[in-house]
């Protein structure tokens, strides 16, 4: 049978052939574009033979945990889609910025000096967004074609509408679906049903009715077919203290014209109910989503809403028996976002949005929580260190040029997505769920630790703990200043903003490290099997104080998001210890962090700590931990991530 050809531009084909010849088959495989991956028959054979989907995919995610025919059909065309996306970006860069720039970008992308995330959908879908559910609450399923929509009238109907909304949004994007105002609207519809005694509901049943709605939501978003028929939707839910609630929703109205501000205390209590019920569910089913962010305002060394802060820390960090079935709370399943201003919030995985920056506040308090990213393209900082060892000036000049090139690539991707919208191919935009006004272009980075190690700016004490030197602190600030200056200069004549993110790098971290091993075998930092997605990677031994210090030092530069994960070998054994730890971290100026635990599950998927299930008595069969930003079973991780997990350091917080 004749070969099946894909029509691509001559310039792109010529350049790709040159890169193949220059860098060899290993780099083609690293890009997911080797002959074996582009061959459907070879891909099928490899898919069947590998242990996990993550090891077979060219763009792995531990959220895709089950090998079945739908997974195969979804993963198989990824290499071809990626090829088409790279071609389109190259073609458009060539048109706008010139042939030399297009070739430079493609070579850096090919050699993993740059890394376009979700590359197989880079020219088809945007990345992530935090959605405002106001239109859904007031109109119903307004985004569906040929569908006579009307607003929900009841609690259960609204939750079902949210499920459809998430599915619609998730399948037309490649990243997280943030839901900052989900709970206020759930409260509204629940209260409406209670006030009207819907279906004869009496007061003693009100709480149970509320909890059933939470169950309905949590089970739905964790079904493994919501996105692309192969995985659950990456959903984020925001939990706010009283100060955040008032600032964000003080001027908002519910569908019946009542003001949210009149119900803030009740909404706060509904948030508690939501998290308490989700914790109860986790006992019988170890679920991944939603990922929570608990937003707390802190001024002058204390939490402004101290009662809510105390409740949140107890709920997240303290293992408490909640019923006679030996079920517990305290799953460490929420990120902490602690700031001295309500103009920022965290959603969409690591995305930190400055509400003032994008004009989210209106004169009566503001409710437009919409914020997201068109796409993320990451700079391999470790590569620059290998190319310019111990030459700060050379490093920073090369970094400036790389940032500018990255901005050009992201600019092209943004314009391609815009044209997709104009062609009517992205109804999530045309129906108003997402808009470009609230979408950043995001520059990612990885490899800060490896940069400092290459420059000799990391010291190790007699106990084996690694510390950044004063030179590392100063050089790190210079790196981020160059990134910000370069991106701000590029954006001067643009109608959008560019932000900066320390990427999770679930699969990118290993690919970038592998590329550097092939190009710089003798000088690459070999401390870990992949590059760290923390300022001091979780597999590097250091003191807790140093980990927090460095994260706090660099955190403010990451307006696109950064989170410090603090691995703990066992849950806090007292509230006082957890309270003191959270306050200590906040006092160091670290705004976004999470405690990361090891959670066990038995064959019935009951969750617990230790080796024996307290619910059914069966032994531990799986272990769960944050692979990057969310809990998944470690046996679904790629081989590189499993190796990294074995090297992670765990803090004793009870000593």
Where are these regions (language model features)?
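Conserved catalytic cores of very large enzyme subunits
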Residues: 3-437, 458, 464-469, 473-614, ...
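Contiguous, well-ordered alpha-helical segments that form the cores/surfaces of helical PPI scaffolds
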Residues: 184, 441-454, 626
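Metallocofactor- and cofactor-centric catalytic cores in central/energy metabolism, strongly enriched
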Residues: 208-219, 453-454, 632, 641, ...
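Core of folded catalytic or high-affinity ligand/protein-binding domains
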Residues: 436-445, 642
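Glycine-centered flexibility sites
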Residues: 444-447, 560, 629, 640
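Short, surface-exposed acidic
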Residues: 460-463, 634-636
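Long, charge-rich boundary regions
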Residues: 617-655
